[in-house]
Amino acid sequence: GFFALTPALIPGWTDDVVRKDRRLAKAMIAGMAAAGAPRSNYIPGQLMVSRDTTSLNVSNVPTVTIEVGNMRNAREARRMSSAAGQREYARWLAAGIENYFASR
C-alpha cells in the first residue's frame, strides 16, 4: 500500500514551508485513498515524517514523496511491474494531485 513521506520541522530549513508540505501530503493521501489506492498497513495514517530526506528538506515549495507500493509484497510487485498496474498508480497519483489543487 501507499504512504506519503514529508519533511519534519527543521528550523532554518523547512520551517517556512512545512505546514504546506503537510497539507500537500494529507491531500495526496485523501485523494489517492478516495480513488481506491490501497493504503500502507505499516505506516500509521499513511504519513511518515522524516528529518533525513535531503530532497524534501531543501525545497522551498510544498513537496512530498509518495511510496506507492512495497516491492517485497508479491501482489504489489506484480502490480508495479505491469502496464495495467502502472496506469492504476498514475490514476491514483493524479487523483491525489487533483485533490490538493481542489482543496487550496
What are these regions (language model features)?
Residues 1-104:
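Active-site-proximal helix/loop segments of hydrolytic enzymes
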